[in-house]
Amino acid sequence: HIRNDGIVTIVLPHGVLFRGGEEGTIRKNLIDHNNIDAIIGLPANIFFGTGIPTIIMVLRKNKKDSDVLIIDASKGFEKDGKNNKLRACDIKRIVDAYKERPEKIEKFARRVSRAEIIQNDYNLNIPRYVDSSEKAESWDIYASMFGGIPEAELQDLSAYWTAFPHLKAALFSPDNEAYCRLNVANLKNAVLSHPDVVAFKTAFQNAFGDFDAYLKSVLIDGMTQLNAAGEEERLSREIFARLAGIPLVDRYAAYQLLDDDWKKIAIDLEIIQTEGFAATKQVDPNMVLKKDAEVQDGWVGHVLPFELVQNVKMHEEVAALRAKETRLSEIAGEYESHLDELSEEDKEQNFVNDAKDAFVAAEVKKAIKAREVEPATMSILKDVDALFAEEKTLKKQVKDDSAALHQRTKGVIEHLTDEEVRDLLHRKWILPLMENLNSLPDAVLDDFVKQLDSVCKKYETTFEDVESQIASTEHELMGLLDDLQGNEFDMKGIAELKKLLGGE
């Protein structure tokens, strides 16, 4: 039993939408009594143990309208092992469509009248009402024969031409009313430098120019008071509002970036609000499992990661340590170079291991002391011996420096000022999100250039060009065949091949 304004959601196999028998009767009754509010098609293989496509059917006891909202969310997911998984942006796209109940969202949702459903014999199969399929690639026969770029294929990019109204004329020259040609040498540079595209990027930068400061005021200044549970939704509305006047950028892609970042922000906020601001200056024992026993292996920041603190507050020490680690990598490469310099005979000596892929340190010293190798080999061995000594010293230094850096980082975190903590939280929470958001226009333009380049290159080589290349290759091969000599049977075979190539 449900209340008069109650809602029921049921997960069902996709087949219940169109099968006959008792399922068809139930479907008819639900439609006739105006109980189906929405049908949401989910990706296949989303539940463990079964790969069948499923739906969510939303039922209302007393609906105010008679339409059924049909959402095809089957294309929005990410792989999670063997299964498919809805991302945060996929879920929000579904929820927003359900709340807003639009007349139509291209390739995603549509509000269907009860009359249309009855006309279709109560068949609710989602593809009948929402076509989410991708357009199949086609080949223009005229362009394949004569070259040129079909206007019809350029119109598939109409959203970009609307956003960049003068770009198309700058890139293409018309051959006739149906075909055109590219008139720039470097497509990517021409697109990215065009005033319309520059204006697009500028508009995005202006929309988010003060977003860093906004996030800082909300998250950093208000970290102890804000409602973490509802803040993500508030921030998503702010992002959507800023994107309202920006074409092409998918607001749900921006939401996914926020959600990815919010996971760590929410955890930190909960710690700060429950344990106090002092928790940001706390370090915890890093407990690891060794031989079935839990033991401490150094320390971890309770809120602030060691790596972040090191990069910001101890960058000189980090740089010195990284330089030594880089040198160790270079030494490994120098070993390989010296191995390549050895003759095959030298590689059979004891100072090279059985796999012939490394020097043996002790045997290198013995060979140098014995002085029984050629001068060139002796020079190589002395260099290798020096590398062994340098490597040994560096490894000890790296180990000691890493331990010292780790211990000093613990002390730095514990003695941070409040202002330093706020700066580090800004770097942890806000800067990564801003960097990812600011990359969205570039991702849009990269995808546009890739699609445009594909269309332009599609008809670069015509059938006539291919035929000409084949004829040229056959002619060249004929010339080579004329120079061949052999016994009677070889020459008969060559003669027959020349016939096939059109030479006789």
Predicted regions and their residues:
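Secretory/endomembrane lumenal or extracellular ectodomains immediately following the signal peptide
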Residues: 305, 313-315
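A conserved structural/catalytic subdomain of Rossmann-like adenosyl-cofactor enzymes
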Residues: 1-299, 320, 327, 336, ...
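Extended alpha-helical interaction scaffolds
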Residues: 301-303
